[in-house]
């Protein structure tokens, strides 16, 4: 009987020790989850974009894919300061500098295409320069003309005008639907590292962050978070370029946080302790890293 009791006590001690050292103890302990707060930043309602008339012609250039193009917003504007990627007013500021586009579903990819860069050029209108303009996907064009072909760029007035000959930007914007050529290119944010903007709805039990300015692929396939003293745990794409993570233990998350990014092509980059222990909602934290 004494040996049996000793064996039972030894097993209990081993189980207790394993729970103490397991990463599950950080924030994934199986207990009743704390209700997740409703984030303050909601995905905007995506409406059809209406600055187009007419029908596209068809021209295909070797090495490039064909797409349609229109523009939305002000003629010299940034398209939208909301958008289905969550970049908000950043689209009109450096390094985006209004050179953006809303992508059709094949480009937006349910939000996974946010941040991807493309060269777009036109040759089918007298106002076209034939020189490509580089745009970043920052919004979704969900229906209407955006579903007419395999791909469609609803560009800001600024990026549409960038494809025009000098002095002919207004004429090009007035052309209606353009048939363009496009190709995926690496994003290049010279002198800018990846930034992490903490959502206003984040709190000690719930963390959500907008990730922007990734060189290379520009878009992300996966994001993992590591709490202080813990292991990596996958985050969940909330919408657009926002990723979320919440405690399932009823205990506050333990900052500082490190974030591990996996790009569309599988390249991995780690921003160690990029979110400090004293982090606050609504604040942007700039990392010291970017894809080379």
Swiss-Prot record:
It is a peripheral membrane protein. InterPro entries: Expan_Lol_pI, Expansin/allergen_DPBB_dom, Expansin_CBD, Expansin_CBD_sf, LolPI, RlpA-like_DPBB, RlpA-like_sf. Its main location: secreted. CDD domains: DPBB_EXPB_N. Gene3D superfamilies: Expansin, cellulose-binding-like domain, RlpA-like domain. Keywords: Cell wall, Cell wall biogenesis/degradation, Disulfide bond, Glycoprotein, Membrane, Secreted, Signal. Residues 82-192 form the Expansin-like EG45 domain. It comes from the Eukaryota. It is found in: Secreted, Cell wall; Membrane. Expressed in internodes. Induction: By gibberellin (GA3) and wounding. GO terms for cellular component: extracellular region; membrane. The keyword Membrane applies. The keyword Kinase does not apply. This is Expansin-B11. The lineage of its organism: Eukaryota, Viridiplantae, Streptophyta, Embryophyta, Tracheophyta. The gene is EXPB11.
């Amino acid at each position: 009987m004494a040996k049996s009791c000793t064996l039972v006590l030894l097993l209990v001690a081993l189980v207790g020790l394993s729970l103490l050292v397991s990463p599950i103890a950080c924030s994934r302990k199986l207990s009743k989850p704390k209700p997740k707060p409703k984030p303050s930043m909601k995905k905007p309602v995506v409406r059809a974009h209406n600055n187009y008339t007419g029908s596209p012609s068809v021209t295909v250039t070797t090495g490039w894919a064909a797409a349609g193009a229109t523009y939305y917003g002000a003629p010299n504007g940034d398209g939208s300061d909301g958008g289905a990627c969550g970049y908000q007013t950043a689209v009109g500021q450096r390094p985006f500098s209004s050179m953006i586009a809303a992508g059709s579903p094949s480009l937006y990819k349910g939000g996974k295409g946010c941040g991807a860069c493309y060269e777009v050029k036109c040759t089918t209108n007298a106002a076209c320069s034939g020189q490509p303009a580089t745009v970043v996907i920052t919004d979704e064009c969900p229906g209407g003309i955006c579903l007419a072909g395999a791909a469609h760029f609803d560009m800001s007035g600024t990026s549409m005008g960038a494809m025009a000959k000098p002095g002919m930007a207004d004429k090009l914007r007035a052309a209606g639907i353009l048939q363009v050529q496009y190709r995926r290119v690496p994003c290049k944010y010279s002198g800018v590292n990846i930034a992490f903007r903490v959502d206003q709805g984040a709190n000690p039990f719930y963390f959500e962050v907008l990730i922007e300015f990734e060189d290379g692929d520009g878009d992300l396939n996966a994001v993992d978070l590591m709490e202080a003293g813990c292991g990596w745990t996958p985050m969940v794409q909330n919408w657009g370029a926002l990723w979320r993570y919440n405690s399932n233990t009823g205990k506050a998350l333990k900052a500082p946080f490190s974030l591990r990014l996996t790009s569309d092509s599988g390249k991995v980059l780690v921003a160690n302790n990029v979110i400090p222990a004293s982090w606050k909602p609504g604040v942007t934290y700039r990392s010291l890293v970017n894809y080379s």
